[in-house]
Every structure is written in C-alpha cells, then in structure tokens.
Amino acid sequence: MATQTNQDHFSGDLRRSWQKIGKLTYGSRQWIVMMASRSAVLKKMLESDEFKTSAKQVGTITLLEMKQEELEAFVEFLYSDGSMLSSKVKQHARALYRAADKYEILRLRELCRSELISSLNSTNSLNLLELAQIPFDKVLNDAALSYIKTNELMFPSFDEFKLFVDNYPNLAVEVMMASLTRTPSTSCSRCGLITYHNQTGTSCCSCGFDYPRRS
C-alpha cells in the first residue's frame, strides 16, 4: 500500500470537513507553520489573539472564500516548491489569483497571472480585464487590453456588459473604440485560426494561405 503524503492527508481532512460542516478548516501544527511561512497575511491571522483564544476551535483557521477543489489546489501549491503550477492548480487559476492577492503569496499570483494571460481568448478577455482592476494589475490589464484591441471580442450578456460600463466607464470606451476601429478578421479555411489578413489582405498572416482578392 502506498504511503500517504502530508498533502494527501490534508486534502482528505479538507474533504471530510466540507462534508461535515460545510466549510473548510484545518489546524495541525505542521499546517500552521507551513501556511505562516508562505504568507505574511496568514501569519498575522495565525498569530492573532482571536485565533489563539478561539473558544470553539482552538488553533483552527477557516478559509470560506474558496470552494473545496479550489482550496485543495491552493494547498497543493503551498506544499510544492513553487516553481510551476500543476494541471490541477491551473484549472483554478482565477480563484487562486484572487487568493494569492488576498494572502500576499506573490509567487502564486505571478504564476496564476501568467496562466490567465496564456488563456486569453475572445470569451474571457473582458472578464480578465475586469479582474485586473481591483487591485490594479498593470501586467494583466495591459495583456487583456492588448488582446481586445487586436482580436475579435465576444461580448457577455447585456446586463454583464452594462455593469462593466457602469464600473469602468473609461475602459468601456476604450474597448468599444477598439471594436469599432479593428481591422476585419476571418477564420482561415486552412489552419482554422481566427486571424487577420496580412497587409495585402489576400493571405492568412499565420499560415500564409492565399485568399481570393476582394472585389
């Protein structure tokens, strides 16, 4: 029988905690030391009088803002060497990006930001642009805005876009101007990539496939 790792043991306890009380908690001494070493914010929480003198759950910290799978991915990263994101952690990059900012885990934030930028597409670019605003992340903001300015954008529902306009009117104007002035694009019949024609307007700028000239 394979030996259970600390991470496996922890994930199992998280799962049982979720099933029993509907929230995710953990309080072993090893976990506390590990969490405190990775995050200055968590360290302050763990050293607070409220944490130390909790009447009901002595030595337990509760993270309610993450769902079960997100928290398990969060823990997986904390137990790793921090050099890269696993496939499981990548699945929750957006939630962990927020958590990394809240708990000031800079390496996790950097890796999640890179993953989000690499995943930019026509359906999520506006959401990622909004994500970059609070707190402001210039790298993610510039990447999302650059994508929007040079690629087709699929707008969300009217209500979602209206909320975006209300919250970020200047950004909304910039997004709309980009949509109005963007060079028309099409899907290449050879490579399938939604891309722009080259300067002559007769071939795909990705694979070079020649299109008939427009009349």
From Swiss-Prot:
Name all BTB domain ranges.
17-87
- Reading the lineage from the top rank, the first entry is Eukaryota
CDD domains reported for this sequence? BTB_POZ_ZBTB_KLHL-like (cd18186)
Q: Identify the metabolic or biological route this protein is part of.
A: Protein modification; protein ubiquitination
Its BP terms in the Gene Ontology are: protein ubiquitination
* SMART domains listed in its UniProt record: BTB (SM00225)
Q: Which keywords annotate this record? A: Ubl conjugation pathway
Comment, domains: The BTB/POZ domain mediates the interaction with some component of ubiquitin ligase complexes.
PANTHER family, from UniProt? BTB/POZ DOMAIN CONTAINING PROTEIN, EXPRESSED-RELATED, GENOME ASSEMBLY, CHROMOSOME: A05
Biological function: May act as a substrate-specific adapter of an E3 ubiquitin-protein ligase complex (CUL3-RBX1-BTB) which mediates the ubiquitination and subsequent proteasomal degradation of target proteins.
Protein name (record): Putative BTB/POZ domain-containing protein At2g05330
Q: What is the lineage of its organism?
A: Eukaryota, Viridiplantae, Streptophyta, Embryophyta, Tracheophyta
